[in-house]
């Protein structure tokens, strides 16, 4: 279904917006609009993506300033009416800062920026983001972050575990020290997803490492169902 309408938010300091648009527009063939952070009209969109990068230079902390951008109020309205929201890397950080997902992303345990390809286990295959993956899949996806260690209080962690909101885990172990090896979580509805790995960087059919392709195909499946 090539009619799924994507929007990719562009903050000052974003640097993965065009990577995402290349996948949604070039690979999936879906209409895709780059949305400047001051825009507020998201009414025609099905999926809004907050991409990776360093929004506002990561001043204060990652995502702390981006949460106040004009587009974020409209994003919350989009989510409230059942729209899909995806946050990748810095986008995940922004979603936690905005309260759309619980917990926080903090400095990596080793205090170093980590740029690598890592093992990622898919914990749920029944979501709009994962249905194209075989049961029990372990992927290889790129990560690139200095503040990617997921943390939350014990009660929140238990809720995430009990409600099945942990979608991706690092396998065999989190390189950044994330609690419970968490690499990505969703809200209770499954329509809002945040993850630190970059599926858009593993989706070019002409390059090695294509484990991100089923991620994007899953989104199309969910709208075709």
Swiss-Prot record:
Associated pathway: Purine metabolism; IMP biosynthesis via de novo pathway; 5-amino-1-(5-phospho-D-ribosyl)imidazole from N(2)-formyl-N(1)-(5-phospho-D-ribosyl)glycinamide: step 1/2
Name of this protein: Phosphoribosylformylglycinamidine synthase subunit PurQ
UniProt xrefs under Pfam families: GATase_5 (PF13507)
SUPFAM superfamilies for the chain: Class I glutamine amidotransferase-like (SSF52317)
Active site (catalytic residues): 89, 198, 200
PANTHER family, sorted: PHOSPHORIBOSYLFORMYLGLYCINAMIDINE SYNTHASE SUBUNIT PURQ (PTHR47552:SF1)
Domain Glutamine amidotransferase type-1: 6-225
Function text: Part of the phosphoribosylformylglycinamidine synthase complex involved in the purines biosynthetic pathway. Catalyzes the ATP-dependent conversion of formylglycinamide ribonucleotide (FGAR) and glutamine to yield formylglycinamidine ribonucleotide (FGAM) and glutamate. The FGAM synthase complex is composed of three subunits. PurQ produces an ammonia molecule by converting glutamine to glutamate. PurL transfers the ammonia molecule to FGAR to form FGAM in an ATP-dependent manner.
Gene: purQ
Keywords: ATP-binding, Cytoplasm, Glutamine amidotransferase, Hydrolase, Ligase, Nucleotide-binding, Purine biosynthesis
Enzyme Commission designation: 6.3.5.3, 3.5.1.2
Reactions accelerated catalytically: N(2)-formyl-N(1)-(5-phospho-beta-D-ribosyl)glycinamide + L-glutamine + ATP + H2O = 2-formamido-N(1)-(5-O-phospho-beta-D-ribosyl)acetamidine + L-glutamate + ADP + phosphate + H(+); L-glutamine + H2O = L-glutamate + NH4(+)
Subunit structure: Part of the FGAM synthase complex composed of 1 PurL, 1 PurQ and 2 PurS subunits.
Taxonomic placement: Bacteria, Bacillati, Cyanobacteriota, Cyanophyceae, Synechococcales
Subcellular location: Cytoplasm
GO molecular function, one term: glutaminase activity
Gene Ontology cellular-component terms listed: cytoplasm
UniProt GO BP: 'de novo' IMP biosynthetic process
Species: Synechococcus sp. (strain JA-2-3B'a(2-13))
């Amino acid at each position: 279904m090539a009619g799924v309408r994507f929007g990719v938010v562009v903050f000052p300091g974003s640097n993965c917006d065009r990577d995402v648009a290349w996948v949604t527009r070039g690979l999936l063939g879906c209409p895709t609009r780059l949305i400047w952070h001051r825009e507020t009209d998201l009414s025609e969109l099905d999926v809004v993506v907050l991409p990776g990068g360093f929004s506002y230079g990561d001043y204060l902390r990652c995502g702390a300033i981006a949460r106040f951008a004009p587009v974020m109020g409209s994003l919350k309205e989009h989510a409230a009416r059942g729209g899909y929201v995806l946050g990748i890397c810095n986008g995940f950080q922004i979603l936690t800062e905005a309260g759309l997902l619980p917990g926080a992303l903090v400095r990596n345990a080793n205090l170093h920026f980590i740029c690598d390809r890592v093992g990622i286990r898919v914990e749920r295959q029944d979501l709009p983001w994962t249905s194209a993956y075989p049961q029990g899949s372990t992927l290889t996806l790129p990560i690139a972050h200095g503040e990617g260690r997921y943390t939350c209080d014990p009660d929140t962690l238990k809720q995430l575990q009990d409600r099945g909101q942990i979608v991706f885990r690092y396998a065999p172990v989190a390189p950044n020290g994330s609690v419970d090896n968490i690499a990505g979580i969703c809200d209770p509805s499954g329509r809002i997803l945040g993850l630190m790995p970059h599926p858009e960087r593993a989706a070019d059919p002409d390059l090695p490492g294509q484990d991100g392709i089923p991620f994007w195909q899953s989104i199309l499946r969910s709208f075709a169902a």
